[in-house]
């Protein structure tokens, strides 16, 4: 299968590319700069979709970059990096004389409203209560294609855990020093997924002809709270993990609106993902963290 991957040079894209190639697929990346097995976004706009069997979009500016202030300019970047790349790919697919069989987009569980009690599956409502939920709604709308000639899948990802990137990269140093702990109250849910499983869900969606619609890209152990995650990471490292990061500090660093992504959370279950036949490599947090820090 020939797969076109937008945003394929990032953390998730690298893992997906490695997995697809290991399964015998050909991968072409869409990036800002040309290179071997790559095209640019400008190429896609001017020359149209290269012949491919499937397309994936992973492109998007890192929302939780602590070096960027949460102001109007950065919010515009966050929006445009997702919506414009998705619209560009969707338009190219719609215009292609031989459209791909599958079109997969990765968004986020920010679609679902934070709650200490609610449980969300793929059919749960959301997408209309704050900047981030509205972003997911617009993002997914930008990917929709007319007709049904191409199978369409959206994977709403949780916090991605893996070596060399993702959420763990920012956490390891304080936890290794014994200075880690829960964020804020620690009571908020922490929907997570191992990078190998997120790549696996994407590959499963590409390869399996009956998979379509929304899939939640989270581990089945979805009742994990932030405090439980902190304890599990401390245990995996053999270090204490009881020093909380105060809410006021998080809000000062990220801004009040963006801090919600860390201080509040959702209990999300992958009901349709499991029903679609995907088998998790890391369904439990302990084993996932052990692999990440090994």
Curated annotation (Swiss-Prot):
It comes from Bos taurus (Bovine). NADP(+) binds at residues 31-32, 58-59, 77, 82, 160. Putative NADP-dependent oxidoreductase. Its EC number is 1.1.1.-. Belongs to the NAD(P)-dependent epimerase/dehydratase family. SDR39U1 subfamily. Keywords: NADP, Oxidoreductase. The keyword NADP applies. One of its GO terms (molecular function) is oxidoreductase activity. PANTHER family: EPIMERASE FAMILY PROTEIN SDR39U1, SUGAR NUCLEOTIDE EPIMERASE RELATED. This is Epimerase family protein SDR39U1.
